[in-house]
A protein has these predicted regions:
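Ligand-binding "clamshell"
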Residues: 87-99, 112-114, 186, 191, ...
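Short, well-ordered beta-strand elements
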Residues: 25-35, 52-58, 125-126
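Pocket-flanking alpha-helical
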Residues: 62-94, 108, 115, 197-202
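A bilobed periplasmic-binding-protein/Venus flytrap-type ligand-binding module shared by bacterial periplasmic
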Residues: 106-117, 219-234
């Protein structure tokens, strides 16, 4: 009788063991972009020391990582925040979900000509990103700086139509996010991404008049997966290494300086 009662438990244990073995048999494949690659490389190296094999795949654009993940060519990607993910899902019908938080890259407002927002003249030009996700973040920054006022509650979905006050009559110019670094020389105020400013090595990434941060948690970069991968033990182990390894934290500090915050600590 006891033998019959315990058989289902044994069967479940064997099944779970087979599932775990199936996950562990292959290296974990992670897709990313250049801005996040170096700290991930440190995590891959640390994972190897702990017996977890990981393959890092670097993409040159922001579309392929989600296409590859959705098709199952990779197991997880790490390059996007929630607004970007939601926009991509709406546009392409991806079945993807956030798995765990990474870092938030502080985004700033930079000026080559002025040292404070008070110095901005009437009609000053302001360059922000032209895509729906990053332009909303730029407008939120301008509102935080006090140079414009937005309708209450619009958040990252803000557009220029949501500006209810613009006392300096700022001229907002929308340009491609990757071109914002170049706009620094011409515009009076520019939305800037420190990770890409550092890559371009064109001006001091720490020189922003204002940064955003964890008050906008929706911009924390996420480890993103397909829903069926949520119980993959390789994911849990790798994320734990990324979030808690001293070697990875040192790599993050070297790559981003003090221009990032740990999303899992906020």
């Amino acid at each position: 009788m006891l033998e019959k009662l315990f058989r289902p438990v044994a069967a479940i244990a064997i099944t779970l063991g087979l599932c775990t073995s199936a996950f562990a048999a292959e290296p974990l494949k992670i897709g990313t972009t250049a801005a996040f690659a170096i700290p991930l490389e440190a995590a891959v190296e640390e994972a190897h020391k702990q017996g977890l094999e990981v393959k890092l795949i670097e993409f040159s654009d922001w579309i392929a990582p989600n296409v590859s993940l959705n098709s199952g060519d990779i197991d997880v990607n790490y390059f996007q925040h929630i607004p970007f993910l939601e926009n991509a899902k709406a546009a392409a019908g991806f079945n993807l979900v956030p798995y765990a938080p990474g870092i938030i890259n502080n985004v700033g407002l930079y000026s080559k000509k002025y040292k404070s927002f008070a110095e901005l003249p009437e009609g000053a030009s302001v360059a922000i990103a032209n895509d729906p996700i990053n332009s909303g973040r730029g407008l939120q920054l301008l509102a935080k700086a006090g140079v414009i006022t937005l309708k209450p509650g619009v958040g990252y979905k803000a557009t220029e139509d949501d500006i209810v006050a613009n006392p300096k009559k700022l001229k907002i110019l929308q340009v491609e996010a990757v071109q914002l670094v170049r706009a620094y020389d011409d515009a009076d105020l520019v939305q800037g991404y420190p990770a890409y400013i550092r890559l371009a090595n064109s001006f001091d990434a720490t020189s922003a008049l204002l940064f955003d941060g964890l008050e906008n948690k929706e911009y924390v970069i996420q480890f993103v997966i397909r829903p069926q991968s949520k119980d993959d033990p390789r994911l849990a182990k790798f994320v734990d290494i990324y979030q808690h390894s001293p070697a990875v934290r040192a790599a993050l500090n070297k790559a981003h300086g003090n221009l990032y915050q740990a999303g899992w600590e906020g």
